[in-house]
Amino acid sequence: MRNQILPLLLVAASITANAQQKKDSLYTRTIEDVKLHKTGNPNNARVSTIKSQLDVMETPQAIAIVTHEFIEQQQAQQLSDVVKNVNGVYITSARGASQDSFGARGYTFGNENIYKNGSRVNSGIFPEVSGLERVEVLKGSAAILYGNVAPGGIVNMVTKKPLFNFGGNIALNYGSWNNVKPTIDIYGGLTKNSAFRVNGSYENKESFRDIVQSEKHYFNPSFLYNISDRTQIIIEADYLKHHFTPDFGLGGLVLNTTTNESKLNTLLGINKFPGATWQYQTNEMLTSTVTLNHEINSNWNFNTVAFFQDYTRDFHGTERIQWNLQNNGDYVWKRTLNKQLQEQKYGSLQFNLNGQFKTGKLNHKLLVGADADYLQADTYSYQLQKQDGTFADAGNNFVYGTNGNTSNGNILLSDENTWKSGEMLNSRQKDLNRIPTRRVGIYAQDLISITDKFKVLAGLRWSYLENKSTIVENYLNNTKTYKASSGNPKESAFSPRVGLVYQIDDSFSTFASYSNSFNPNSGRDINNLPLPSSLIDQYEIGLKKNLWKNTLAFNITAYQIENSNLAQTAAFDKNGNINGDTNIKEMTGATRSRGIELDVTGNPTPNLSINAGYAYNNMVYTDTPDSEGSFVEGERLVRTPANTANASIFYTLPKYVKGLKLGFTAFYTGERLAGWNNLKDKNGNPKTNRMYEIGDFTTVDFTIGYQFKKFNVQGRLGNIFDVVDYNVHENYSVNPITPRNFYLTFNYKF
């Protein structure tokens, strides 16, 4: 990856050297949404995530937008700080503190649900928020536009774009635990037809957690050129390197290793770190995007987006902290050590044609598009050298106990002296697993205005997914083999979408919609054949209302999502014997997710901005076989809070102390279940409880800032009441939320 960074630096240097301080005197395609940034009302916006010319008010789907103004007001440090402003979106876990995992409407987001400028991007890294223009969240199914995505929604990060008027800002941030972060953003015109932007940051910080520290570099140059009055090209690059201490938190307390019955670990202080003092993880990601926009005429336009991503994850450390209860009442963790290198190369290409036309008395807004992508995912596994000089596979079976003991990995929760780690061990590469995947999609949708008020949206997507055989290269015996994919090698599906919109006027609309998506499954059936995808139906109704002279959005949505063919462990094998292989499955389960979402967003006055929301979700298993290994009907799925809420208010004093801004933010996360959902025994009854409850919590932040001419000073006191709670992945990555903290920003705009 390093040999690809130098060209970025040269491009940025040439751009900056040739920058001209010149106002835009030529018509150009609008980069910033003026209505959105002026009113703060997402209902007034044109959202790039939906790929079409539809306004938010005529789109039969819930949409949320968090602008850069709000990101800056809240002094957000990572993407999770941003999406918490979207009702119904929540953090499901923070596995190893290497990434935030999000969920919505009962479903967990994966790589298929996180996008940058409309292109799928790896979610295994903390994105840099200082380079974001805004974050768009398309709730519910987005299958017709993006293919096999989880039905909870997608998050699209829109990066800052070039501007023709010269300007920028320089900022220095400082916070708790020696958090130092300078940022810079410079933009301007190069010629009357071209413009640039360069922004970047450096962050170095420690943590309230012992041992844990982090260092991050970010660089984002972009270039815009108006080829003609109707044609524009934007070239962007984005480089992020994050070196940090992987942190699996406090670990769970396992009461029974046979049943995995567990409970929350409250025996350790939130600062305690039982891992190796030297462990590390380095994530690097380089992305580049080329976007071509062309207006054919006043009614028709198309755009093409080419995207490339190079991602690397280098991990070496302990993981999966599980304290097992002993007969003497103490807890023991058999500490293990792993080393792994992951490399991903991903490329995508999409084409969208939008047009407006009439057939008789009917008005149409048509979208026709196609996309294709290719992913090569490489995973290198390692062997580590034991104290006796021999090598053994790194992972769950390689123990690493007190002072680096490689024959006895047991450490005691009650005795921190047993946590001591030795030096980093020698290693050698064992093998490479390469998984190639490619996807193709073709889609079309049309919004038909039957009357000025009544509109119908109909669309269809065909998706093709190919999972090629995994290539395995063993470096120890110099062999190369192929093994079948764990999923279906070739699969295709149609995803329909139908919506009805009744728009009373420009400020009030109601809608109802149906959409269908598919979710690929891993595993095999009893005949050793790959499983088909699960098909998921979603129904949604809602209303969108603009208040206060269209400066305030009030939206309500209700939904139901049904998965009627959930893949579960098969009860019996093909010979009729009880099945003990969890990789052998059958399409016999069903889940249902129901919920409501309410939000109020906007700037009712020039000095006041409001963002508030509430969401309720209930996702349960509705149908499972009465056989051993099946899930339990009526049981809520783990990691999905029933209730979430958010409220933020910022007010700038117009007189007396002009320029003084005060802000208040509160986030509520309801009770959740950690661990794993329960399974039935051979009689169809629930086995020992594998889940445990995590209590609800509310964090409150207070912000104060003062702006004088081009200078701005702002401070935030986070988690004022020093609330203690946790994000939990299964039963082993138990990460405490950040305690009371402060964050200061000194900013100069030019």
Model regions and ranges:
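Outer-membrane beta-barrel translocator/receptor signature
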Residues: 131-133, 144-221, 227-231, 286, ...
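Acidic/polar loop-and-plug regions of large Gram-negative outer-membrane beta-barrel proteins
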Residues: 203, 207, 222-226, 230-295, ...
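Gram-negative outer-membrane beta-barrel transporters
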Residues: 452, 586-677, 745-749
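Face-selective signature of the C-terminal outer-membrane beta-barrel domain
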Residues: 288-311, 336-471
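Acidic, small-polar-rich N-terminal luminal/periplasmic segments of exported/outer-membrane proteins
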Residues: 30-165, 541
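Structural signature of Gram-negative outer-membrane beta-barrels, strongest in the C-terminal barrel
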Residues: 226-228, 344, 363-365, 371-375, ...
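Membrane-embedded beta-barrel scaffold of Gram-negative outer-membrane proteins
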Residues: 293-297, 301-307, 313-317, 509-510, ...
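C-terminal beta-signal and adjacent terminal beta-strands/loops
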Residues: 564, 610, 667-684, 705-750
